[in-house]
C-alpha cells in the first residue's frame, strides 16, 4: 500500500492537472453520489488535501470528496477525450476542458459537507500528518510520551495511523534504522537523546521521501536524497556498521533491520 509521501505526490499530480479549472463533466459510479454530478459540474477543484492515506478533494461550492485507496484504488491523470486501456473499474471521473482525473477500484468514497468533514470517523481517528509542515518534533515527542502511546512497541505504533498519519512499513523500517532502535522498543524506555532523535526522524524521513524519492543526486551529496538503507536489502551489508541486514516479520508485516547496530 502506498504510504504518505506517495499519496501526497499523487495529490500533487492531480492538483496540477485540474486545480482551478471549471469541471466540464463529473461522473460517479456509486448511486449515492449520482446527485452530486450536476452540483459539481461548473465548479472548481480548489485544493486536494491528504490526511495520511486519504485524499480530500475540495470543491468551490464547499463540498469535499473523501476517498481512501485502501489496497487497490488508484488515481490517473489523462488528456480529456483519451480512453485508457485498463481492466480496472472506474469509480470517479472529474473532467476539465484539457485534463481529466480518474479514480479506479476504490470503494471507500464519500461526499462530505464542511460540517461532516469535522465529524468523519476516519478523519476523527487519524493522527497528525507527518507531511504537515506545521507539525514539529516537539509535538511528536509529546505524542510519543502520551499515556495512549508511550507503552506501545514501535513495531505496531509506527503503523498506527492514529499515532501519526502517513507512516507505513517502509517508513517504519527506515526510521528505526536511522535512530538505531528495534521494533520492540517503547517510548517510555528511551533516554532523552533517543527520544529527540526519534521525534526528528519521524518527520525528517517521510518529508525527505516526499521531496526527493526517485530523483537522481547528480552532485553525489551523500544523504541528500532519500533512498532505502535497509528496506528490501536483507543479506546486504549495513552501510553504517557493516553488519548483515536481516528480514523478519513484525506486526504481520516484513521488517528489515541490522541486528549489529539496532539495539
From Swiss-Prot:
It holds the Pfam family Fapy_DNA_glyco. Keywords: DNA damage, DNA repair, DNA-binding, Glycosidase, Hydrolase, Lyase, Metal-binding, Multifunctional enzyme, Zinc, Zinc-finger. A zinc finger (FPG-type) spans 229-263. PROSITE patterns: FPG_CAT (PS51068), ZF_FPG_1 (PS01242), ZF_FPG_2 (PS51066). Its cofactor is Zn(2+). Its EC number is 3.2.2.-, 4.2.99.18. Involved in base excision repair of DNA damaged by oxidation or by mutagenic agents. Acts as a DNA glycosylase that recognizes and removes damaged bases. Has a preference for oxidized pyrimidines, such as thymine glycol, 5,6-dihydrouracil and 5,6-dihydrothymine. Has AP (apurinic/apyrimidinic) lyase activity and introduces nicks in the DNA strand. Cleaves the DNA backbone by beta-delta elimination to generate a single-strand break at the site of the removed base with both 3'- and 5'-phosphates. The lineage of its organism: Bacteria, Pseudomonadati, Pseudomonadota, Gammaproteobacteria, Enterobacterales. GO terms for molecular function: class I DNA-(apurinic or apyrimidinic site) endonuclease activity; damaged DNA binding; oxidized pyrimidine nucleobase lesion DNA N-glycosylase activity; zinc ion binding. Belongs to the FPG family. The gene is nei. One of its GO terms (biological process) is base-excision repair. The active site is at residues 2-3, 53, 253. DNA binds at residues 70, 125, 169. It catalyses: 2'-deoxyribonucleotide-(2'-deoxyribose 5'-phosphate)-2'-deoxyribonucleotide-DNA = a 3'-end 2'-deoxyribonucleotide-(2,3-dehydro-2,3-deoxyribose 5'-phosphate)-DNA + a 5'-end 5'-phospho-2'-deoxyribonucleoside-DNA + H(+). Binds 1 zinc ion per subunit. This is Endonuclease 8. It comes from Salmonella dublin (strain CT_02021853). It comes from the Bacteria.
Amino acid at each position: 500500500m502506498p504510504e504518505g509521501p506517495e499519496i501526497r505526490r499523487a495529490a500533487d499530480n492531480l492538483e496540477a492537472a485540474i486545480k482551478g479549472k471549471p469541471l466540464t463533466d463529473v461522473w460517479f459510479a456509486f448511486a449515492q453520489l449520482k446527485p452530486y454530478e450536476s452540483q459539481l459540474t461548473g465548479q472548481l477543484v480548489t485544493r486536494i488535501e491528504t490526511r495520511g492515506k486519504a485524499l480530500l478533494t475540495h470543491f468551490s461550492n464547499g463540498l469535499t470528496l473523501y476517498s481512501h485507496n485502501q489496497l487497490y484504488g488508484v488515481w490517473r491523470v489523462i488528456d480529456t477525450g483519451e480512453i485508457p486501456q485498463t481492466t480496472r473499474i472506474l469509480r470517479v471521473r472529474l473532467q476539465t476542458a484539457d485534463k481529466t482525473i480518474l479514480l479506479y477500484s476504490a470503494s471507500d468514497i464519500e461526499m462530505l459537507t464542511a460540517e461532516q468533514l469535522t465529524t468523519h470517523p476516519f478523519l476523527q481517528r487519524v493522527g497528525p500528518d507527518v507531511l504537515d509542515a506545521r507539525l514539529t518534533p516537539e509535538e511528536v515527542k509529546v505524542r510519543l510520551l502520551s499515556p495512549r502511546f508511550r507503552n506501545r512497541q514501535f513495531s505496531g505504533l509506527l503503523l498506527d495511523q492514529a499515532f501519526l498519519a502517513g507512516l507505513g512499513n517502509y517508513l517504519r523500517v527506515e526510521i528505526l534504522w536511522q535512530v538505531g532502535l528495534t521494533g520492540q522498543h517503547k517510548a517510555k524506555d528511551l533516554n532523552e537523546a533517543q527520544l529527540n532523535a526519534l521525534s526528528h526522524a519521524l518527520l525528517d524521513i517521510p518529508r525527505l521521501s516526499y521531496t526527493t524519492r526517485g530523483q537522481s543526486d547528480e552532485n553525489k551529496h551523500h544523504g541528500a536524497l532519500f533512498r532505502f538503507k535497509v528496506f528490501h536489502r536483507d543479506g546486504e551489508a549495513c552501510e553504517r556498521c557493516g553488519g548483515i541486514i536481516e528480514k523478519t516479520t513484525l506486526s504481520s508485516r516484513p521488517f528489515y533491520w541490522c541486528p549489529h547496530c539496532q539495539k
